[in-house]
């Protein structure tokens, strides 16, 4: 299973992103491939929140278009919503305690815990994920 961080979703969609070409190509391959994609709600919510924000984008995506994009991802046969399970709280709190992170990295710890709990790889362009022990993650913009 591959779990995408919100920055992967944004870069795959935003043609003006410096990582768009590489990540969009990778994302299309993943969506059309055999690997299961676990889409967490936090990544979907973040995508819609950010891509529609006029303070971030000069020409923000409309809410309707952002929803259509998210629905198109969820309609793929290899995509499923991934949710916290019974071990999530222990893994999540353990990551916070062992790394000393919180604040802006709290959501990153949540995503790391999801990936660890589900035996998944996390896809992100954010190097902050390197600080979480036992997390398997990669940057699809540089993955060969």
Kindly give the residue locations of the regions a language model identified.
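Acidic active-site catalytic centers that drive phospho-/nucleotidyl reactions
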Residues: 5, 108, 126
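Active-site neighborhoods of divalent-metal-dependent phosphate/nucleic-acid chemistry enzymes
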Residues: 60, 78-123
